[in-house]
């Protein structure tokens, strides 16, 4: 499972001029990119998220027993609950207090959320514009796709914010959030005709679904139709397919690939043991003449 996460996941992803990430791009109280000092260097914005990506991969792929692997593993704990972690997005984790101590123990969110979700659309869009510029994306056609903070749909909160530039797709898939959110999560669908959101009703139990003939109900909301139909040749996938014909990564020396993987500069494919490789149920047999 961990190898699959490293092979398919990342701290952030850019796809078809959309910026996808789980938590936040850490900001300071003034709405500027938070400056983080680590290892004698100062990082902010995209550079900080790239550093987090490299350290996370270093903690898993660096040689066993090496200082690089130890530092990377320590850094994974910071990503989990650090105040300027782009995955955590809060000033502290108060899970222990919530579980064992009566009272309120607020976890203050990073200023990113106050700016990007600001009721003043000019402030929210201005923040989105700076983030798009930081990642080299076009503001007019792009979106930020965010998770982490459940959308309280039952209270009228909308998942599309900042004048359509921010899409929050965490609708509370976890059962513990259903009462708070009123739904069981969102699915963002990007098709050739535009973007749409599907909100899902909670699934109570298999027994109730069978006895009452219930299904998971989903509602669809097309919020940004495409001006013209998008074809495969217009996507980032087409660029990757084109590049694969021009160069074969398998020709990269094995020694160099292992070094890049250990430092977190390239992703590792998910491991599949021989038992996991699908085989035909009735393999053809060779006849001897």
Regions inferred by a protein language model and the residue ranges of each:
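Feature recognizes metal-dependent phosphohydrolase scaffolds
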Residues: 1-289
């Amino acid at each position: 499972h961990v190898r699959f996460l490293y092979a398919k996941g990342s701290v952030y992803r850019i796809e078809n001029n959309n910026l996808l990430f789980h938590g936040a791009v850490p900001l300071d109280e003034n709405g500027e990119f938070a400056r983080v000092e680590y290892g004698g260097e100062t990082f902010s914005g995209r550079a900080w998220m790239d550093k987090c990506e490299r350290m996370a991969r270093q903690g898993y792929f660096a040689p066993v027993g090496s200082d690089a692997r130890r530092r990377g593993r320590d850094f994974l704990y910071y990503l989990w609950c650090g105040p300027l972690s782009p995955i955590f997005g809060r000033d502290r984790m108060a899970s222990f207090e919530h579980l064992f101590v009566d009272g309120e123990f607020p976890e203050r969110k990073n200023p990113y959320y106050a700016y990007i979700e600001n009721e003043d659309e000019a402030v929210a869009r201005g923040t989105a514009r700076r983030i798009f510029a930081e990642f080299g994306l076009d503001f007019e056609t792009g979106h930020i796709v965010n998770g982490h903070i459940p959308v309280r749909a039952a209270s009228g909160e909308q998942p599309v914010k900042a004048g359509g530039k921010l899409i929050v797709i965490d609708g509370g898939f976890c059962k513990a959030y259903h009462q708070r959110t009123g739904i069981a999560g969102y699915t963002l669908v990007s098709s050739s005709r535009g973007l749409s959101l599907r909100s899902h009703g909670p699934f109570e139990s298999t027994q109730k679904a069978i006895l009452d003939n219930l299904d998971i109900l989903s509602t669809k909301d097309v919020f940004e139709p495409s001006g013209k139909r998008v074809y495969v040749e217009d996507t980032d996938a087409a660029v990757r397919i084109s590049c694969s014909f021009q160069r074969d990564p398998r020709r990269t020396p094995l020694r160099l690939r292992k070094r890049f993987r250990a430092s977190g500069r390239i992703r590792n494919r998910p491991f599949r043991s021989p038992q996991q490789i699908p085989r035909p149920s009735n393999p053809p047999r060779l006849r001897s003449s």
